[in-house]
């Protein structure tokens, strides 16, 4: 680990010093932009879905080959299950990170939501990636806080429970781009709340939303949905000390997309007050109150109105997490989560840091 860390320290030093002046603000690279022409091509495999390009080159099998991870995934007592909240506002968290060096202060913000009452948070990989930097802390001081409430206030710390190795591998070379491009493919992560910031015991249960990883029908077009998140437009305009207010909005599905899987991997939703930087990682719920997707990118405002968004489907999450680990999303929410998070860190964090370092060469 010391060798990989040394390599990574060099990468991170370059990463942190490329800026010429001290700057405090929200990093726009956490909000990937869609290429303007990706929505115009129809899939040859399924004419019911619009094709999004897949940049994925290979699927790392490190977790499939890790005996420790496989054992941790099936061991331990079954935890709490089932929804404990119905209002998405109650389930929202804001993930707020800072990275301080003598040269700069970098601030990032994103949304997440409780998907399991044992304290599991779902968010974007492009938000959770900062916890990889926080785990290293080489050339500066990294701090990430899970904030809750209205306005968002610091409440918890969290550890990485899962981030797709394929996503990190595919995005390592562009993670420090000011405005990286992306479609949302495998852009998800699971975090586990580890402690409170005020020294109090952790809650007996967290406000988790009901969710569904069922395949979305093409009849979803124009269906009503609810989107929620912590949009950071005011923070961008007024500075990092601005209160972050959770928002939810009624909107509807405008289009379904596939990465070539013959299934709906991404869907577009029409504009709302939620649609701004910082909302990435927020849930999208169907009319039954189930989370069916998670916000990953901004949408096409010219087509869907100001504040439009795109979300990856939970069926995409379920299928791809199974492909990379051998276990479904639901299976990742069971068992000894603390042990699994520890094994993830021991097994995968050095591997991911090595990918990040090599991606910058």
Where are these regions (language model features)?
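Active-site region of chymotrypsin-like
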Residues: 88-105, 194-210, 236-331
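N-terminal targeting leaders that route proteins to membranes or the secretory/organellar pathways
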Residues: 1-84
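Catalytic-histidine neighborhood of serine endopeptidases
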Residues: 109, 116-183
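A conserved glycine-rich beta-strand in the N-terminal activation segment of trypsin-fold
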Residues: 77-81, 96-118, 124, 281
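Extracytoplasmic
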Residues: 87-92, 107-110, 116-118, 122, ...
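C-terminal cap/linker of serine protease catalytic domains
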Residues: 143-148, 152-169, 199-206, 231-233, ...
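Active-site substrate-binding loop(s) of clan PA
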Residues: 131-132, 170-182, 193-243
């Amino acid at each position: 680990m010391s060798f990989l860390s040394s390599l990574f320290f060099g990468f991170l030093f370059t990463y942190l010093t490329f800026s010429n002046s001290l700057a405090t603000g929200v990093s726009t690279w956490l909000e990937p932009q869609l290429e303007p022409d990706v929505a115009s091509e129809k899939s040859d495999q399924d004419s019911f879905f619009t094709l999004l390009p897949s940049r994925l080159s290979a699927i790392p099998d490190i977790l499939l080959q890790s005996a420790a991870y496989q054992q941790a995934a099936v061991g331990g007592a079954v935890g709490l299950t089932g929804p404990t909240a119905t209002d998405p506002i109650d389930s929202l968290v804001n993930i707020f990170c800072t990275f301080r060096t003598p040269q700069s202060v970098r601030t990032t913000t994103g949304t997440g939501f409780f998907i399991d009452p044992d304290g599991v948070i779902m968010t974007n990989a492009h938000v959770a990636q900062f916890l990889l930097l926080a785990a290293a802390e080489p050339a500066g001081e990294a701090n990430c806080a899970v904030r809750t409430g209205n306005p968002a206030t610091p409440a918890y710390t969290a550890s990485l429970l899962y981030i797709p190795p394929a996503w990190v591998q595919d995005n390592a070379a562009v993670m420090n781009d000011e405005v990286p491009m992306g479609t949302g493919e495998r852009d998800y992560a699971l975090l586990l709340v580890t402690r409170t910031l005020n020294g109090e015991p952790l809650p007996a249960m967290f406000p988790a939303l009901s969710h569904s990883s069922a395949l979305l029908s093409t009849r979803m077009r124009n269906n009503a949905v609810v989107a929620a998140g912590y949009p950071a437009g005011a923070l961008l305009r007024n500075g990092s000390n601005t209160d972050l207010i959770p928002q939810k909005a009624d909107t509807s599905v405008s289009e379904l997309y596939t990465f070539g899987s013959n299934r709906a991997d991404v869907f577009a939703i029409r504009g709302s007050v939620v649609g701004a930087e910082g909302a990435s990682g927020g849930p999208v719920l169907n009319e039954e109150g189930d989370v069916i997707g998670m916000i990953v990118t901004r949408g096409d405002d010219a087509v869907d109105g100001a504040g439009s968004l795109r979300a990856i489907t939970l069926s995409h999450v379920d299928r791809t997490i199974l492909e990379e680990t051998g276990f479904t999303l639901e299976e990742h929410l069971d068992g000894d989560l603390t042990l699994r998070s520890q094994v993830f860190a021991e097994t995968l964090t050095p591997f991911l840091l090595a990918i990040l370092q090599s991606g910058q060469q």
